[in-house]
Amino acid sequence: MEIAYCPDYRSYKKIIPTLRKYSEDVIITIDDDVLYGHETLEYLINAYLQEPEYIWFMSGSKMAFDKNGNIKPYVTWYDEHLTALECNIKNFPTGIGGILYPPHSLAEEVTDETLFMKLAPTADDIWLKAMSLKQGTNCRQIKLNKPVMRFHTGIKEVQTSALCKDNIEKNLNDKAVHAVFDYFDLWKLFN
C-alpha cells in the first residue's frame, strides 16, 4: 500500500493522482465513507476480464431526458430503469459501489485540474462520465443476483456531511452537468 499526498482536489483526490501515475493500469475507485463486502473487487475485476472494453460499476443510474431531449434534474435519474445487462450511453456510474476504469477509457483532459475545478469542482462522477463519453467508452453495471446494498454499507457518522448531499440539495450536480457537457459539446451524443 502506498499513501500519496496531493493538492486538495476534493472528491477528485481518489482518482486524479492515480491516473497520472498509473495511466497504463486498471484503476478501481471506491468511496471512503462506505464499508464494502469482500466480493466487491472480485465482481469488478471478473467483469473487466470478461469484457475489458467497458467501464464497470456496481451502483448507478441512467441519465434522464424529457420528451424534447432536454436533460432532467439529476435527482430524477434514479427514477429511470437501469438494466444491468444493457449497455447504454446514458448509464451513469456512481462511486458508492465501486467503479473500474480500464486503461485509456477516459479522455486525456481527465487530469486537467484547472478545467475540472472550474467546470465541476464538487462533481467528480459527472466529470468522469463526460470523459468516458468524450473517449467513446461505454459504462456497464455489473449484474448481481442480489441488491448492491448488501455489498456495502454507509458509515453514518460521515454520511451526514457527505459531498453528495451538497451536490443534490444545492443542485450542484445539475450545474456541473450543464457546464461540462456544454463545454465539450457532449449533448450531440444523445441525439
Language-model segments: what does each one mean?
Residues 24-35:
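Short beta-strand-to-loop acidic/aromatic patch adjacent to the donor-nucleotide binding site
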Residues 6-14:
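A short, glycine-/small-residue-rich helix N-cap motif at loop->alpha-helix starts
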Residues 18, 35-114:
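Conserved catalytic core of nucleotide-sugar-dependent glycosyltransferases
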Residues 15-26:
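Active-site nucleotide-sugar/metal-binding loop of Leloir-type enzymes
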Residues 1-4:
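Acidic donor-binding segment of Leloir-type glycosyltransferases
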Residues 114-191:
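C-terminal catalytic/acceptor-binding lobe
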Residues 24, 51-54, 137:
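Short, high-confidence coil segments that cap the C-terminus of an alpha-helix
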